[in-house]
């Protein structure tokens, strides 16, 4: 299974990290978790005018099919265990986007019942400020998430050199 002939003109070499990260960033499947008015702007982002599909971003209704969760709106302390459960059901690797002032910092609701930022419970990768943020802001935030994914280091072990043979695992 090794390379028996020299590389031709139409051959591209790359690292496995780059290839996997390109595939991951080109097919983000977010789980929507709209809790307030930010959810309306999130729905507008998925509509024809902004068309998230052109970026490979397709909303999923099941956490088991999603690799990103967009927390949009006010998170109450009663809702927090549900959000954590949904997050735990998502397969690895997974990313979190906090959309809106309420998800980022609690917004104007400085009360005992509102979580003052979802980052108290989940590791947030991208913050999108605004009340509510415009669809363009969500698009920009998702493109920043794509940039972050493209630069991640994966742990795929050692690389296989050119001309080396792969042996099946025992």
Curated annotation (Swiss-Prot):
NDH-1 is composed of 14 different subunits. Subunits NuoB, C, D, E, F, and G constitute the peripheral sector of the complex. Binds 1 [4Fe-4S] cluster. It is a peripheral membrane protein. It holds the Pfam family Oxidored_q6. InterPro entries: NADH_UbQ_OxRdtase-like_20kDa, NADH_UQ_OxRdtase_20Kd_su. GO terms for biological process: aerobic respiration; electron transport coupled proton transport. The keyword Transmembrane does not apply. GO terms for molecular function: 4 iron, 4 sulfur cluster binding; iron ion binding; NADH dehydrogenase (ubiquinone) activity; NADH:ubiquinone reductase (non-electrogenic) activity; quinone binding. It comes from Geobacter sp. (strain M21). It is found in: Cell inner membrane. NDH-1 shuttles electrons from NADH, via FMN and iron-sulfur (Fe-S) centers, to quinones in the respiratory chain. The immediate electron acceptor for the enzyme in this species is believed to be ubiquinone. Couples the redox reaction to proton translocation (for every two electrons transferred, four hydrogen ions are translocated across the cytoplasmic membrane), and thus conserves the redox energy in a proton gradient. It comes from the Bacteria. NCBIfam families: nuoB_fam (TIGR01957), PRK06411.1 (NF005012). This is NADH-quinone oxidoreductase subunit B. Its EC number is 7.1.1.-. Its cofactor is [4Fe-4S] cluster. Belongs to the complex I 20 kDa subunit family. The keyword Transmembrane does not apply. Keywords: 4Fe-4S, Cell inner membrane, Cell membrane, Iron, Iron-sulfur, Membrane, Metal-binding, NAD, Quinone, Translocase, Transport, Ubiquinone. One of its GO terms (cellular component) is respiratory chain complex I. It catalyses: a quinone + NADH + 5 H(+)(in) = a quinol + NAD(+) + 4 H(+)(out). [4Fe-4S] cluster binds at residues 37-38, 102, 131.
